[in-house]
Amino acid sequence: MKIIKRNGSEVVFDISKIIAAVTKANNVVPAAQQLSKQQIHAIADHVQAVCGARNHAMNVEEIQDLVENAIMDTGAHEVARKYITYRYVQGLKRTHNTTDDRILSLIECNNEEVKQENSNKNPTVNSVQRDYMAGEVSKDLTMRMLLPPEVVKAHEEGIIHFHDSDYFAQHMHNCDLVNLDDMLQNGTVISGTLIEKPHSFSTACNIATQIIAQVASNQYGGQSISLTHLAPFVDISRKKIRRDVEAELKNLDVRPSEEKVSEIVEGRLREEIKRGVQTIQYQEVTLMTTNGQAPFITVFMYLGEAGDNQRLKSDLAIIIEEMLRQRYQGVKNEAGVWITPAFPKLIYVLEEDNVREGTPYFYLTKLAAKCTAKRMVPDYISEKKMREYKLSKGETEGHGDVYTCMGCRSFLTPDRSGNGWDNIANAKNYDGKPKYYGRFNQGVVTINLVDVALSSGGDFDRFWKIFDERLDLCHTALMCRHNRLKGTLSDAAPILWQYGALARLQKGEPIDKLLYGGYSTISLGYAGIELHHPPLQTPPGAVHRQRLYL
C-alpha cells in the first residue's frame, strides 16, 4: 500500500510514523489523560485498515485527518488537541521562512554560492549584504507563495531558469532605454526636488549621473543612455563661454581677432567636455545604488542620431572622442594602477560617415578600435544591418531603426505602432516617430536546451515534444512576470513612471497601458551549446552539424 507525500511522490505506507506522532502527543499530557500503548497501536491499525480499503492512494493530509478522528473516537480529547497542535507546528515548519541559515551565512561571509553569483558585487560589504538579505527574503516568498508549483519545480530542477527571483516579490521591471532627452530638456524630479533644464554641458552630465543612480535603484536590470541627448548642451556651454570670454576681454580692454576668440572659446569648451565625460565615468564606477552595486549602464554612441544637424553631429563627435579617450586610459585602482572599469559599457555604431578611410568621422572608428583592443569596449552595431532588420510599422528594408540594447543584451522590438503608440507614456519630447527611449523589458525566463536534448535520448521527435512542453512552462513563468507588474502604480517608482525616465504618468495611475501592444517586451532566453556529432545514418568519417536557433 502506498500514500502520496506533499511533494507529490508516492511512498510505501509506514505505520510506525503514525505510532510515533501519536506517542509524541500522548507523552505531553497528564498521565491520567494518556492513551495506553495498546490504544495507540489500535488507532494506527484502524488508519492502516481505512487506507487499505480505499481504491486510491491517500495523501498525507487525509491520513492525518483519520488519525485525529480516531483519537477523538477514543475519548482522548487532550491527546487529540496536542496532536492537532503538533500537526500545526509541523505545518508551520514546512511553510515558515526557510532563509535563516542562508542569511546568517551571508552575514558571516560563508555563503559560497553568493560569493560567486555576481562579480559586480562584493558580498563582504554591508550595503551589498543588505541587498542580498532582502534578496533571500524575496526568493523565499517567490518560491513558496508567488510562483505556481510547476514553475518552482522546473526552476529547481534546472529545466528552466526564472531569473532575478531576488527582486520578484516587488513590482519591479528588468531593463530599459532611459528617455534622458525628455528629462534634461523638460525637467525632472529627483528625491522630491525639481531639476530644471541645465545651463551647461557639465551640469547636464552631473544630472545624468544622478538620474542613472535613481533609475538603477528602482529596477534590477541594466539601462542605456545616449550621448546624443547630452550633445545639445555643448552649444549651450559654447555660447555661455563665449559671453564670459568676451566680457573678460572687454574688462581687459583687449580686442583680439574673432579667430582668436573662437580659439579660446573652443579650448575652454574642450576642457568642460573633458570634465563632463570624466564626471560620467567616475560617478558611474563610484556611485552605490540601493542594489548594493554601481549602476549597470550602457552608453550609446551614434552620430546618425543627430540627423542633418551638422553642428549637433560635430559636438556629438567631440563627446564620443572624449569618451573613447578616457575609456582607453581607464581608471586607477587603489594601488594607483590604470585598470579597465566595468562600467559604463560602450556601444559604437558603424555608419557611412565613419566606416571607411576618407569619411568625416573615420578617426573615431580608429580610436574605438584602439580602445577595444586594450579595454574590450566599445561593442559595435552596424547601422546598415539594423536598418535592414529593425523595421517599425510602415518602414521598408534599408530604412529601419537604429537603437541600442537595454543594458548589455536585450533589444526592444521595433515600434509596431510606427508612431510611438500615440504617446501613451505622455513624454514631453514626443515627435510622432517610432519610439525606443522610454521603453522597457518586463523580465526574463530561460529554457535549458541542453536538458531538452539529453532528455530526448537522441530522438528528434521526442526532442520537439519535450521542447514544446518546456516552452509551455516558460510561457507560464513569463506570464507570472507580466502579471506581477499589472496594477503597479506610478508611485512605486516616481523617477521612472512620473518624471520622465520611462513615462510621465499621473500620481496613482497604474502602469498597465505600458505593458501591452509591444510597447514593452518580455524575454525568453535559452541556455545551450552547438553540438557536432555524426547522426546514426551518417557515413563513417562524415561530419554532421546540428544547430538550433531561437
Question: Where on the chain are the PLM-derived regions?
Answer:
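Conserved catalytic cores of very large enzyme subunits
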Residues: 89-518, 539-542, 546-550
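Charged, amphipathic alpha-helical regulatory modules used
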Residues: 1-110
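Structured core elements
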Residues: 2, 12, 298-300, 446-448, ...
